[in-house]
Design a protein with these regions (language model features):
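Retroelement reverse transcriptase polymerase core
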Residues: 1-172
Length: 172
């Protein structure tokens, strides 16, 4: 609750269980099992980029920067009328998400649509985006800083935060 991602809820129509999933780092991640909700949601078929095409698009570029959005899905606010559909039960009470949680059927497509709109002027030209992973690319070393400035201006405009521990700048 301190992060502002969830709020307490009473008498929700939907209620999911919490499951703990062990991360590669050995830490545990709390996840909500949205199986029942996902069954009744229509599928959003928004396409994800093909990894092989993204890799091919880096050919001929001298510098690359890899960036990762900080808790990417959690940076998207849920519509007020949809928040209670994400209700889950804990030993402390019932809560729902105010932001898009991991585990929703259409979260990945929703996020990809958002970043495609955000970076539409850059994708294919000097940037590629796969869900919450961003790749900034420059054919000349001298232009890389300008491309990063353009990218950071867009991130600032949409108030998107990065995870600095997962960002790698100026890879040759």
């Amino acid at each position: 609750m301190a992060a502002g991602f969830i709020r307490e809820v009473y008498y929700p129509e939907w209620l999911a269980n919490v499951v703990l999933v062990k991360k590669a780092s050995g830490k545990w991640r709390m996840c909500v099992d949205f199986t029942n909700l996902n069954k009744v949601c229509p599928k959003d078929s928004f396409p994800l980029p093909r990894i092989d095409q993204l890799m091919d698009s880096t050919a001929g570029h001298k510098l690359l920067t890899f960036m990762d959005a900080f808790s990417g899905y959690n940076q998207i606010r849920m519509a007020k009328e949809d928040q209670e559909k994400t209700a889950f039960i804990t030993s402390q009470g019932l809560y729902c998400y105010k932001v898009m949680p991991f585990g929703l059927k259409n979260a990945r497509a929703t996020y990809q649509r958002l970043v495609n709109k955000m970076f539409g002027q850059q994708i294919g030209r000097n940037m590629e985006v796969y869900v919450d992973d961003m790749l900034v690319k420059s054919k000349e070393e001298l232009t890389h800083l300008d491309v990063l400035k353009e990218t950071f201006a867009t991130l600032k405009k949409y108030q998107m935060r990065l995870n600095p521990s997962k960002c790698i700048f100026r890879v040759a």
